[in-house]
A protein has these predicted regions:
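Active-site "cap" helix and flanking loop/linker of ATP-utilizing ligase/carboxylase catalytic domains
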Residues: 106-128, 143-174
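Conserved anion/nucleotide-ligand pocket segment
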Residues: 1-17
């Protein structure tokens, strides 16, 4: 399984456990990490929450897009070529454009759009991460935000426009 602190970002504290003893060790590690007074001050009770998910093998991708009336416009589809198999999941490399076959890319776009609609997202930025497992697209996360950290620096649009400027222009209807 995979343990994910819900209050952290950038895959911080995301740990894989393959057996009960590994789960106990990973959970204790997270309890110590999440006991940080500064983190507790910022996050309150939520800073202690941990999500536990099944581990899903497969090739991982990330999609950046904008939604307009529920329709997805893909801005970038990134391959994550490093195998993200655990025990930690630090993402070090993104490749764009994706090298996946066009049919697979279309399935990813469709799955992201349907997931965003199911979450009630209709307008604005969307960041999604998925894995391709046994030929199927599995959503790992989908959120009404842009890619985190300094990763947006990888993207430049018409006239050198940044991702942030593009999102602001979209919000203003331009």
């Amino acid at each position: 399984c995979v343990l994910k602190p819900t209050f952290l970002a950038a895959s911080q504290g995301v740990l894989r456990a393959n057996a009960p003893d590994e789960f106990s060790t990973a959970f204790r590690t997270l309890q110590e990490m999440l006991a940080d007074p500064e983190l507790r001050k910022r996050g309150g009770e939520r800073a202690k929450w941990v999500l536990v998910e099944d581990y899903l093998p497969g090739r991982e991708v990330s999609l950046e897009g904008v939604l307009t009336d529920g329709r997805l416009q893909t801005l970038a589809l990134f391959d994550k070529p490093d195998p993200l198999t655990g025990p930690t999941f630090a993402e070090m490399l993104y490749i764009a454009p994706s090298r996946l076959p066009e049919a697979v890319q279309q399935r990813i776009r469709k799955e992201v759009e349907q997931t965003a609609q199911a979450l009630g997202l209709t307008t604005g930025p969307v960041h999604a991460e998925a894995r391709i497992h046994q030929g199927k697209v599995w959503m790992l996360e989908c959120a009404a935000r842009t890619i985190g950290g300094l990763c947006s620096r990888m993207l430049a649009f018409s006239g050198g426009m940044s991702l942030e400027a593009l999102i602001l222009r979209h919000a203003l209807g331009r």
